[in-house]
Amino acid sequence: MRVFNFSAGPAAMPEEVLRQAADEMLDWHGSGMSVMEMSHRGKEFMSIHEAALTDLRDLLGVPASHRILFLQGGGIAENAIVPMNLLGARKTADFVVTGSWSQKSFGEAKKFCAPHLAASGKTEAGFTRAPARAEWQLSDDPAYVHLCTNETIDGVETFEIPDLGDVPLVADVSSHILSRPMDVAKYGVLFGGAQKNIGMAGVTVVIVREDLLDRALSICPSAFEWKTIAANNSLYNTPPTYAIYIAGLVFQWLKRQGGLEAIEARNIEKSKLLYDTIDASSFYLNKVEPAARSRMNVPFFLADETRNEDFLAGAKARGLLQLKGHKSVGGMRASIYNAVPLEGVKALVEYMKDFEQRGA
């Protein structure tokens, strides 16, 4: 029996994609091989690779000024890879810290430069807001400005993206990429791990403006130097072939759904249903300011936290899994990525109401 999976990542996958991958597991398109067995330089995998790059460019509307790279290491590795590729001769980078992940990025940058905290969304209740551009106090000559546009742990999403002129904007988009249209031209760099909306863990997507490819520090390993990766079409070393294949299937699935405009409408409907249920209740609480609430990751807390384990056990009995909040903040978290159907959110909302009534 398939369950409704609310995991923050690795996360729910479109069932169509899983079934197609299962059908093609032993024999991809008459090749007699599994994708797992293919040479990454053979014509079979090259067709998969190129299709994935093309479909992602189409979905996001990536302009010709930007290159799409497939790397490894996840968003965590990019926290080091970004400064090694962008600092050049500059000594600082600016950070807008809106949650746990951008805070981690800020800390990692200290190994390479003197990062500057341009703004913070932290309040007495934790990370609950996304500072507006007017609040950003940028340094005089930063190499770039870093922003995590969706904080997976804290449930904070930044929707208003400013134009910073000549200063490159770097965004960690791991947990909301492909959930809505984006103006990629506004960014110098976008990066994201695949295990939320792109596909399975193992591949990291980096989208970088081509004129930024000449800034790498001399200490940057060749395998992580974007210029080298771009020059070799993301095939400098053996790529995570199966993860790229799965990502390509997800891109095709997204196109069949009507693209990102259609997906965004679904995500708005799903998140509104869940937030409305929380707000109408005196038993559940979400601490994030409404304007900054994530459509992908919805943390919530029970008024009586001694009942947390009962809540999780009851949810599991109904086939609602992976609802436990991150250990750093506690409570609950429902991650409702693209592949989580509206029916799953409706089932969760029904359970939440039933649980509240039983405890009243």
From Swiss-Prot:
Biological process, per Gene Ontology: L-serine biosynthetic process; pyridoxine biosynthetic process
PROSITE patterns, alphabetized: AA_TRANSFER_CLASS_5 (PS00595)
InterPro entries reported in the protein's UniProt record: Aminotrans_V_dom, Aminotrans_V_PyrdxlP_BS, Pser_aminoTfrase, PyrdxlP-dep_Trfase, PyrdxlP-dep_Trfase_major, PyrdxlP-dep_Trfase_small
Domain of life: Bacteria
Cofactors, names only: pyridoxal 5'-phosphate
Entries under NCBIfam families matching the protein: PRK05355.1, serC_1
Function noted in UniProt: Catalyzes the reversible conversion of 3-phosphohydroxypyruvate to phosphoserine and of 3-hydroxy-2-oxo-4-phosphonooxybutanoate to phosphohydroxythreonine.
Quaternary data: Homodimer.
Listed name of the protein: Phosphoserine aminotransferase
Native source species: Burkholderia cenocepacia (strain HI2424)
Gene that encodes the chain: serC
